[in-house]
């Protein structure tokens, strides 16, 4: 693994190795701390979008591993005033041992990684959110003991979370169902990847069909538009029936896990009652962002 830009960068063995290392680092941290695997290493934390969990978990994770993490808002860099992306990449690659970047276009991230000359980690693009999906899979494995053969259902917008969860779930040997309105389907290349897995993948617009006998149901914010705008009102109409409610989940497994990458819009993609009922696994999922990201850093920078 040279970078982590999208889930399809990983082989099944590499995915399992990341989760195994994350388990080890989490256990060590609970016992008092991890070895300074990143001693003398520097990590640029470059953000073009607002962030709570990604920024703070990377800052804490780099510190816990003995490295130095520098946060930078791209609006405050020369890149925010027109400096070409390729120049920023070639400069930061000479200062830092690794770059984490949260940005909009996946193509920008891919170009940056080609030029930086150091490992680059996707902190979220409009196409992919691999760090979050690694945390999701870690949480499922912790609570269920295995991933292979379990039914994972995603309900919502077929954007970054759906794209990454489909690929990650299939790489882990899960049965994956994606439930989304017809006009909010996942990326074409993701669907092409998924269809190679045959009956292990199912795409539907029917939430009741999708959650049937699911072991895990995941969702994410689907009303990403500014409240009160025409786009927001359109999304509210388009996603009627796609809220995770107690009634919808009645057809899932009795011990179904519910995951949400946060932030949650209660009353939109998930009801308040379902969110609070499943808060323990949702906040384990949030904590595990820290541990899987530490694992990725340790593998990329310390040969773990």
Where are these regions (language model features)?
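Rossmann-like adenosine-cofactor binding region
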Residues: 195-273
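Glycine-rich phosphate/diphosphate-binding loop of Rossmann-like nucleotide-binding domains
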Residues: 48-60, 142-220
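Positively charged, low-complexity intrinsically disordered leader regions
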Residues: 1-56, 60
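Active-site cofactor/substrate anionic-group-binding motifs, chiefly glycine-
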Residues: 42-43, 47-95
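Anion-binding alpha/beta catalytic cores of soluble intermediary-metabolism enzymes, centered on
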Residues: 90, 97-168, 260
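Adenosine-phosphate binding glycine-rich loop
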Residues: 255-256, 261-304
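Short, structured coil segments at secondary-structure junctions
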Residues: 65, 95, 115-117, 172, ...
């Amino acid at each position: 693994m040279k970078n982590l830009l999208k889930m399809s960068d990983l082989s099944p063995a590499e995915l399992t190795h990341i989760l195994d290392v994350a388990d080890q680092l989490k256990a060590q941290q609970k016992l008092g701390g991890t070895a300074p695997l990143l001693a003398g290493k520097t990590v640029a934390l470059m953000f073009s979008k607002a962030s709570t969990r990604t920024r703070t978990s990377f800052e804490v994770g780099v510190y816990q591993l003995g490295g130095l993490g520098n946060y930078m808002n791209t609006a405050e860099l020369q890149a925010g005033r027109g400096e070409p992306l390729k120049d920023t990449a070639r400069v930061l690659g000479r200062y830092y041992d690794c770059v984490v970047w949260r940005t909009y276009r996946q193509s920008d991230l891919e170009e940056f990684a080609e030029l930086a000359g150091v490992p680059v980690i996707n902190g979220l693009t409009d196409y992919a959110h691999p760090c979050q999906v690694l945390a999701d899979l870690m949480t499922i494995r912790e609570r269920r003991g295995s991933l292979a053969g379990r039914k994972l259902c995603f309900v919502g917008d077929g954007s970054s979370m759906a794209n990454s969860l489909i690929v990650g779930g299939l790489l882990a040997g899960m049965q994956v169902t994606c439930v989304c309105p017809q006009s909010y389907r996942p990326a074409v290349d993701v669907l092409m990847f998924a269809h190679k897995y045959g009956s292990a993948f199912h795409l539907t617009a029917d939430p009741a069909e999708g959650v049937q006998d699911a072991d895990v149901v995941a969702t994410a914010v689907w009303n990403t538009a500014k409240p009160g705008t025409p786009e927001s009102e359109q999304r509210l109409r388009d996603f009627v029936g796609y809220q995770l409610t107690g009634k919808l989940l009645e057809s899932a497994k009795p011990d179904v896990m519910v995951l949400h990458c946060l932030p949650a819009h209660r009353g939109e993609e998930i009801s308040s009652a379902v969110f609070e009922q499943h808060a323990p696994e949702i906040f384990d999922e949030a904590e595990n962002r820290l541990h899987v990201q530490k694992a990725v850093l340790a593998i990329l920078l310390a040969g773990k």
